[in-house]
Amino acid sequence: MTQLLAITGTIAAIATAIVPQQGSVGIVRVSGSQAIAIAQTLFHAPGKQVWESHRILYGYIRHPQTRQIVDEALLLLMKAPRSYTREDVVEFHCHGGIMAVQQVLQLCLEGGARLAQPGEFTLRAFLNGRLDLTQAESIADLVGARSPQAAQTALAGLQGKLAHPIRQLRANCLDILAEIEARIDFEEDLPPLDDEKIISDIENIAAEISQLLATKDKGELLRTGLKVAIVGRPNVGKSSLLNAWSQSDRAIVTDLPGTTRDVVESQLVVGGIPVQVLDTAGIRETSDQVEKIGVERSRQAANTADLVLLTIDAATGWTTGDQEIYEQVKHRPLILVMNKIDLVDKKLITSLEYPKNITQIVHTAAAQKQGIDALETAILEIVQTGKVKAADMDLAINQRQAAALTQAKISLEQVQATITQQLPLDFWTIDLRGAIQALGEITGEEVTESVLDRIFSRFCIGK
């Protein structure tokens, strides 16, 4: 995709998910200078309905040559600049499914539109000044949100809660640059620069950047979720734990060791964070080739998980098998889950032995659905203590934004070093301009075409 391509021509795409025989409504979106003309060719509105902006018309979509009715539909007309793209936009609200929307899209393409590239509607909104780059990225995050908190954070970005502080930081850098350049151009007419004040201002900007950088881990958690692996010996209650936690019968539960032969996955939300829970096969030495594959997959799941729930049988206590598994997973953030406590005398639970460097212990009786709240609390404690990091701010930055903020901070540190070394003022401006450019990349005030391509390729065709 190129910027020239993105702002020329009229584009069309299906804007809703295509679910065969399930979706009740399907939307075809058209944007560009020919959008209204295409709609007037295809759409027949009976009676005295008026084609006005931001009004919904009822009627029929007809083939322009055969006049055959393709669908009974609603038409929404939005004239520039009061539309998502700030261009003329029409939306055909058709019956759901596959056939109707595909036929309508084909008629739009035959009428002069071209098929939109992924994210091209939002790219046009950005290029036409309706959105900045952080807001555009927030739209993608909102569409892909997997939890209420992820959606709320994306909405905060869409409302400009990230763009505003970034613009203010950039403006502060520009003010400092103006002071320095004024001394370069009019040195004899102005008082000397206050070096200490400039350093103080730069330190304040860098401190605010550090606060924003602290939200990166939270952003990653909300976007990708927390991957949690339940591991342990066979028959310690791992599958029962998954079923109790997910409130379903995702995993088969029997009294026979080795029942789980593969990794069973369930998607949950804990404290607003999407959690991918993996119930793994019991880890032990075995001659069964199928079970051996399952054991190897269990080890792989544990080694790639953000958090490991090492599950043991409280009735049998800590065994050599538990110790062997612990040695394999102790390098990961870990919670020890003592399961089946309903089978143990309460007085004996506190005397159960385990490695003393395990600090997070949860007692559960998964078969009785007991201890799940305590388990979720322990997980959130690990997240909040930084073992799996997440900040408490309303907003959260992504990897691209974090890279730009990091570069801005490095540039500001280099400015400070330049001032301390008493180098000429021209040298001060070089790194200061670097910080300004890095901050501008976040909101899109200074951004390359390749970056735009990378960002908007994340979107679906109709967004």
Swiss-Prot record:
<comment type="function">
    <text>Exhibits a very high intrinsic GTPase hydrolysis rate. Involved in the addition of a carboxymethylaminomethyl (cmnm) group at the wobble position (U34) of certain tRNAs, forming tRNA-cmnm(5)s(2)U34.</text>
</comment>
<dbReference type="GO" id="GO:0005525">
    <property type="term" value="F:GTP binding"/>
</dbReference>
<dbReference type="InterPro" id="IPR031168">
    <property type="entry name" value="G_TrmE"/>
</dbReference>
<dbReference type="GO" id="GO:0002098">
    <property type="term" value="P:tRNA wobble uridine modification"/>
</dbReference>
<dbReference type="InterPro" id="IPR027368">
    <property type="entry name" value="MnmE_dom2"/>
</dbReference>
<keyword id="KW-0963">Cytoplasm</keyword>
<comment type="subunit">
    <text>Homodimer. Heterotetramer of two MnmE and two MnmG subunits.</text>
</comment>
<keyword id="KW-0819">tRNA processing</keyword>
<feature type="binding site">
    <location>
        <begin position="254"/>
        <end position="260"/>
    </location>
    <ligand>
        <name>GTP</name>
    </ligand>
</feature>
<dbReference type="InterPro" id="IPR027417">
    <property type="entry name" value="P-loop_NTPase"/>
</dbReference>
<dbReference type="InterPro" id="IPR027266">
    <property type="entry name" value="TrmE/GcvT_dom1"/>
</dbReference>
<keyword id="KW-0342">GTP-binding</keyword>
<comment type="similarity">
    <text>Belongs to the TRAFAC class TrmE-Era-EngA-EngB-Septin-like GTPase superfamily. TrmE GTPase family.</text>
</comment>
<keyword id="KW-0630">Potassium</keyword>
<feature type="binding site">
    <location>
        <position position="463"/>
    </location>
    <ligand>
        <name>(6S)-5-formyl-5,6,7,8-tetrahydrofolate</name>
    </ligand>
</feature>
<feature type="binding site">
    <location>
        <position position="235"/>
    </location>
    <ligand>
        <name>K(+)</name>
    </ligand>
</feature>
<dbReference type="GO" id="GO:0005829">
    <property type="term" value="C:cytosol"/>
</dbReference>
<dbReference type="InterPro" id="IPR004520">
    <property type="entry name" value="GTPase_MnmE"/>
</dbReference>
<feature type="binding site">
    <location>
        <position position="91"/>
    </location>
    <ligand>
        <name>(6S)-5-formyl-5,6,7,8-tetrahydrofolate</name>
    </ligand>
</feature>
<feature type="binding site">
    <location>
        <position position="254"/>
    </location>
    <ligand>
        <name>K(+)</name>
    </ligand>
</feature>
<feature type="binding site">
    <location>
        <position position="259"/>
    </location>
    <ligand>
        <name>K(+)</name>
    </ligand>
</feature>
<keyword id="KW-0547">Nucleotide-binding</keyword>
<dbReference type="InterPro" id="IPR025867">
    <property type="entry name" value="MnmE_helical"/>
</dbReference>
<keyword id="KW-0479">Metal-binding</keyword>
<feature type="binding site">
    <location>
        <begin position="235"/>
        <end position="240"/>
    </location>
    <ligand>
        <name>GTP</name>
    </ligand>
</feature>
<dbReference type="InterPro" id="IPR006073">
    <property type="entry name" value="GTP-bd"/>
</dbReference>
<feature type="domain" description="TrmE-type G">
    <location>
        <begin position="225"/>
        <end position="384"/>
    </location>
</feature>
<dbReference type="GO" id="GO:0003924">
    <property type="term" value="F:GTPase activity"/>
</dbReference>
<keyword id="KW-0378">Hydrolase</keyword>
<feature type="binding site">
    <location>
        <begin position="279"/>
        <end position="282"/>
    </location>
    <ligand>
        <name>GTP</name>
    </ligand>
</feature>
<feature type="binding site">
    <location>
        <position position="130"/>
    </location>
    <ligand>
        <name>(6S)-5-formyl-5,6,7,8-tetrahydrofolate</name>
    </ligand>
</feature>
<keyword id="KW-0460">Magnesium</keyword>
<dbReference type="GO" id="GO:0030488">
    <property type="term" value="P:tRNA methylation"/>
</dbReference>
<dbReference type="Pfam" id="PF01926">
    <property type="entry name" value="MMR_HSR1"/>
</dbReference>
<dbReference type="GO" id="GO:0046872">
    <property type="term" value="F:metal ion binding"/>
</dbReference>
<dbReference type="Pfam" id="PF12631">
    <property type="entry name" value="MnmE_helical"/>
</dbReference>
<feature type="binding site">
    <location>
        <position position="29"/>
    </location>
    <ligand>
        <name>(6S)-5-formyl-5,6,7,8-tetrahydrofolate</name>
    </ligand>
</feature>
<dbReference type="InterPro" id="IPR005225">
    <property type="entry name" value="Small_GTP-bd"/>
</dbReference>
<protein>
    <recommendedName>
        <fullName>tRNA modification GTPase MnmE</fullName>
        <ecNumber>3.6.-.-</ecNumber>
    </recommendedName>
</protein>
<dbReference type="InterPro" id="IPR018948">
    <property type="entry name" value="GTP-bd_TrmE_N"/>
</dbReference>
<dbReference type="Pfam" id="PF10396">
    <property type="entry name" value="TrmE_N"/>
</dbReference>
<feature type="binding site">
    <location>
        <position position="256"/>
    </location>
    <ligand>
        <name>K(+)</name>
    </ligand>
</feature>
